[in-house]
Amino acid sequence: AKKRFGDKISIDLESKVKDGKAFADQAIIAGCSGGTYDNLSEAAAIMKGKTIGNDYFTMSAYPQSTPVYLATTRNHIAEELLEAGVVIKPAFCGPCFGAGDVPANNGLSIRHTTRNFPNREGSKPGQGQISLVCLMDARSIAATAANGGVITAATDIQYEDTHKPYSVSYTHL
């Protein structure tokens, strides 16, 4: 970054490591690829009975569509995520192009989104602002959230997803 932008920006990755563990500041599960029913269901199963805590770490989830949002509500998935401290947002493409939940300056954001457009995820390097973005799978994001923001792979935890499979009815249309 210094080679490209000179002294305009400063990246502080060392502040994200405490006691040998890497910490994220923000987590997002969103968009047409991230906010699927299955991803949100698995995230809720991982988060069940746990919390993101009340410190600096935040997490938001954007269902991929209104029918998915409705199904997560009917099957208690949204309820379990909310109880864990996850903020449920409307079905919206914003996080992919930087219009929702952009990371703070020097914030480390873990995201399951479709895209990470250059300079859209909170970064404006020409103005001295840079964010740190790691694209991850929804399950590892939930594992990280359940672990207080410590970067955690979903393969490192045990959980069972007992939610109903996704189905949608168009009889009301």
Which stretches of residues belong to each language-model region?
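Accessory "access/gating" subregions that flank catalytic or transport cores
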Residues: 1-53, 61-76, 80-83, 90
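A glycine-rich phosphate-binding loop feature that marks nucleotide/adenosyl-phosphate handling sites
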Residues: 62-65, 94-104, 157-167
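Flexible, glycine/charged-enriched surface loops at secondary-structure junctions
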Residues: 53-59, 151-161
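Conserved small/polar residues in nucleotide/adenosyl-binding loops
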Residues: 171-172
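Short C-terminal domain-edge/linker segments immediately following a structured domain
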Residues: 57-60, 90-93, 140-145, 163-164
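Thiamine diphosphate
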Residues: 71-140
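Structural motif
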Residues: 25-27, 57-60, 86-88, 107-110, ...
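Structural signal for hydrophobic packing residues in well-ordered secondary-structure cores
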Residues: 44-51, 85-89, 114, 118, ...
